[in-house]
């Protein structure tokens, strides 16, 4: 059996928890909770988590499906180098971002999800995984002479392949199923 790539699961979990943090923060801020400033913090933390987690990392084996518009955020995440590539740093960053939001009921679900994502990232880091960007593969252009072996000799419309085989057999002198010459003379007398 193949080995589980934990970073892929942590990425999905962290992205979902960032969206949940944003939603809980909007509820807390718009609802004018007593600690509404923690709701505003949750919105900012959720946006930061979503921006960091939106670009998927390249899988070590197999192909990775890129998210829509990921290539633009991938450049930004690549700029931070080891700060974003190392999963130990991501695990502790997510855990640190989750703690203040845990003191408000509207954002506690996002906090729990982000803490779970942090644990999965820690597991991925222990197993030696690290983030690497999905690089677009250069498109190979087919060689012009390599795909066409022999250009057609007669212009279109061409007869079907079976008819072309019969024509080539007739040219070679091979008898076909058509009319044959009778070696005995036949006299036709009509009465």
From Swiss-Prot:
Belongs to the p22phox family. This is Cytochrome b-245 light chain. Phosphorylation at Thr-147 enhances NADPH oxidase activity by promoting NCF1/p47-phox binding. Ubiquitinated at Lys-149 likely by RNF145. Keywords: Cell membrane, Electron transport, Heme, Iron, Isopeptide bond, Membrane, Metal-binding, NADP, Oxidoreductase, Phosphoprotein, Transmembrane, Transmembrane helix, Transport, Ubl conjugation. Component of the phagocyte NADPH oxidase core complex/cytochrome b558 complex, composed of CYBB (heavy chain (beta)) and CYBA (light chain (alpha)). Component of the phagocyte NADPH oxidase complex composed of an obligatory core heterodimer formed by the membrane proteins CYBA and CYBB and the cytosolic regulatory subunits NCF1/p47-phox, NCF2/p67-phox, NCF4/p40-phox and the small GTPase RAC1 or RAC2. Interacts with NCF1 (via SH3 domain). Interacts with SH3PXD2A. Interacts with DUOX1, DUOX2 and TPO. Interacts with NOX4; this interaction mediates superoxide generation. The chain crosses the membrane at residues 8-30, 36-53, 87-104, 106-126. It is found in: Cell membrane. Its main location: membrane. The gene is CYBA.
């Amino acid at each position: 059996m193949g080995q589980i790539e934990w970073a892929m699961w942590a990425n999905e979990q962290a992205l979902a928890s960032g969206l949940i943090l944003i939603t809980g923060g909007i509820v807390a801020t718009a609802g004018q909770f007593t600690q509404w400033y923690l709701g505003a913090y949750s919105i900012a933390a959720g946006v930061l988590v979503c921006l960091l987690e939106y670009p998927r990392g390249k899988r070590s084996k197999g192909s990775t499906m890129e998210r829509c518009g990921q290539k633009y955020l991938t450049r930004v995440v690549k700029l931070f180098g080891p700060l974003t590539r190392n999963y130990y740093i991501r695990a502790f960053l997510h855990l640190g971002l989750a703690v203040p939001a845990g003191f408000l009921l509207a954002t506690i679900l996002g906090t729990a999800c982000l803490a779970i994502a942090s644990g999965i990232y820690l597991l991925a880091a222990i197993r030696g995984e690290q983030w690497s960007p999905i690089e677009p593969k250069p498109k190979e252009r087919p060689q012009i002479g390599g795909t066409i072996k022999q250009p057609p000799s007669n212009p279109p419309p061409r007869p079907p392949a079976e008819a072309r085989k019969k024509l080539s057999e007739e040219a070679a002198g091979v008898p076909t199923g058509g009319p044959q010459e009778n070696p005995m003379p036949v006299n036709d007398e009509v009465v």
